[in-house]
Amino acid sequence: MKNARTTLIAAAIAGTLVTTSPAGIANADDAGLDPNAAAGPDAVGFDPNLPPAPDAAPVDTPPAPEDAGFDPNLPPPLAPDFLSPPAEEAPPVPVAYSVNWDAIAQCESGGNWSINTGNGYYGGLRFTAGTWRANGGSGSAANASREEQIRVAENVLRSQGIRAWPVCGRRG
């Protein structure tokens, strides 16, 4: 009785208490079987001549998940509606010139960037044709934009300095 109580307690703790028919209950009564007798052809049991059984996966283990194509440890990417809208185009950055070219043009030509007086000097900063071409200008300075004339004037300033405008350069 003590063994039955211990077995019932252990089964209840393990959660494996199962009802069975009385025929399946083992007892100590002699059933006419000799456990030490040689096994007959109908006996089922261990055969030392057979190779070991392959390891089988446990029955309760779910199949391994297929490769999902992403790292499950990382958060999912943001949905397209949560992405920030494209940035608006910033206004162009104003160009910082090394001198005040408008002040020099005001002194040289009265601020007229397309002046051609016929004296061999052209545009608001009064370029000669040779100086204009040598410093990256194309066509005539009188037909060039203010920005183009200033670009060429910056090249002249780097090669000749402000003395290229001997009277009006000091105003820049």
UniProtKB/Swiss-Prot annotation:
GO terms for cellular component: extracellular region. Gene3D superfamilies: 1.10.530.10. Induction: Expressed in actively growing cells. Disruption phenotype: Not essential, disruption of rpfE alone has no effect on growth or survival in liquid culture, nor in mouse infection models, although colony size is reduced. Alterations in gene expression are seen. All 5 genes in this family can be deleted without affecting growth in culture, however quadruple deletion mutants (rpfA-rpfC-rpfB-rpfE or rpfA-rpfC-rpfD-rpfE) are not able to resuscitate spontaneously in the presence or absence of O(2), and are attenuated in a mouse infection model. SUPFAM superfamilies: Lysozyme-like. Its EC number is 3.-.-.-. One of its GO terms (molecular function) is hydrolase activity. Might be a good vaccine candidate. Residues 33-89 are annotated as: Disordered. It comes from the Bacteria. Residues 49-65 have a biased composition (Pro residues). Factor that stimulates resuscitation of dormant cells. Has peptidoglycan (PG) hydrolytic activity. Active in the pM concentration range. Has little to no effect on actively-growing cells. PG fragments could either directly activate the resuscitation pathway of dormant bacteria or serve as a substrate for endogenous Rpf, resulting in low molecular weight products with resuscitation activity. Belongs to the transglycosylase family. Rpf subfamily. This is Resuscitation-promoting factor RpfE. The gene is rpfE.
